[in-house]
UniProtKB/Swiss-Prot annotation:
GO terms for cellular component: chloroplast inner membrane. It is a multi-pass membrane protein. Pfam families: CemA. Its main location: plastid. This is Potassium/proton antiporter CemA. Belongs to the CemA family. GO terms for biological process: potassium ion transport. GO terms for molecular function: antiporter activity; proton transmembrane transporter activity. InterPro entries: CemA. The chain crosses the membrane at residues 7-27, 114-134, 154-174, 189-209. It catalyses: K(+)(in) + H(+)(out) = K(+)(out) + H(+)(in). Keywords: Antiport, Chloroplast, Hydrogen ion transport, Ion transport, Membrane, Plastid, Plastid inner membrane, Potassium, Potassium transport, Transmembrane, Transmembrane helix, Transport. The gene is cemA.
Length: 229
């Protein structure tokens, strides 16, 4: 009975870790054909935001300039003009296909993330007892660590998250999440998140040290500041 009681929270922990990945993969595979059919069968007007429109226009202008340059290099004849028009049409169709694939990717990932969020929320509510047990195990594990190990772990974590070299890591992580959610890549928004989010985390962390650690373990705070200096 005790082994079963201890095994259940571990099984729940493994499910929490691997369930999002499995759900995302499963729903992507199952919804992909349906979203493709729905998008291709739809006759709705295409809406482009400023970023998408600018990106497509830049690609098309770049393509047109390359083809014009190619025509200037070759002999000027009716055959070459015909090839030029055909090349423009083919590349225009390719750009439209790229746009359609991007929109399908956005719809697919947005729908998948909503479904996964709902399922994980229900999973967390139903597994409240297991969460309590896991929380007690975590607290017991942290309590048994020495203050030096705790201070070192806190210092390592903060340096990784809000240290001098952390912006590049944040940029990769935010960009990955941004892409996974199905949004169009935007350097300005990503740069804004990278420049503000670590600052907010740093403020919250300092407040946590001031309010919680000073009261619970003053020696840990002293060791942390000594190692940080």
């Amino acid at each position: 009975m005790t082994k079963k009681k201890a095994f259940t929270p571990l099984l729940y922990l493994v499910s929490i870790v691997f369930l999002p990945w499995w759900l995302s993969l499963s729903f992507n595979k199952s919804l992909e054909s349906w979203v493709n059919n729905w998008w291709n069968a739809g006759q709705s007007e295409i809406f482009l935001n400023d970023i998408q429109e600018k990106s497509i226009l830049e690609k098309f202008i770049e393509l047109e300039e390359l083809l014009v340059l190619d025509e200037l290099i070759e002999e000027y004849s009716e055959t070459h003009l015909q090839k030029f028009r055909i090349g423009i049409q083919k590349e225009a169709i390719q750009l439209i296909n790229i746009y359609n694939e991007g929109r399908i990717h956005t719809i697919l990932h947005f729908s998948t993330n909503i479904i996964c969020f709902v399922i994980l929320s229900g999973f967390s509510i139903l597994g409240n007892e297991e969460l309590v047990i896991l929380n007690s195990w975590t607290q017991k594990f942290l309590y048994n660590l020495s203050d030096t190990v705790k201070a070192f772990s806190i210092l390592l974590l903060t340096d990784l998250c809000i240290g001098f070299h952390s912006p590049h890591g944040w940029e990769l992580m935010v960009g990955s999440v941004y892409k996974d959610l199905g949004f169009v890549h935007n350097d300005q928004i990503i740069s804004g998140l990278v420049s503000t989010f670590p600052v907010i985390l740093d403020t919250i962390f300092k407040y946590w040290i001031f309010r919680y650690l000073n009261r619970v373990s003053p020696s840990l705070v002293v060791i942390y500041h000594s190692m940080n200096d």
